[in-house]
């Protein structure tokens, strides 16, 4: 669009076909919400697993029957699971509150809309300043010859 709101009819690039490719990017708020949801689900799954293993450990400890080695094996797995859940929780919370800068190191994606509007402005200014060159045939048609 030029300053006088006249539509510019620009020829396509070399090859005769104009292709407009727009990179679709998920908004930052959407990414943040999905990340928070995934982290919450991971913590809830870990807490649920801890609850189930604790219940199994309590039921095997209360039996005090013929098993002598089994409760010890369950307790080892329970300690490993506790360690895994605590590590997962610390890792998730550390990433949320800026403990690591792996998100800051990611390059900011270009704003396609701003770049396109800037390009349109440049094209419009070029047309307004220099005028549009029409082929000789169109100039002659406009004059009526």
Curated annotation (Swiss-Prot):
It is found in: Host cytoplasm, Host perinuclear region. The keyword Cell inner membrane does not apply. GO terms for cellular component: host cell perinuclear region of cytoplasm. Keywords: Host cytoplasm. Its main location: host cell. Pfam families: Adeno_52K. The keyword DNA-binding does not apply. Induction: Expressed in the intermediate phase of the viral replicative cycle. InterPro entries: L1-like. Very stable protein with a low turnover rate. Belongs to the adenoviridae leader protein family. This is I-leader protein.
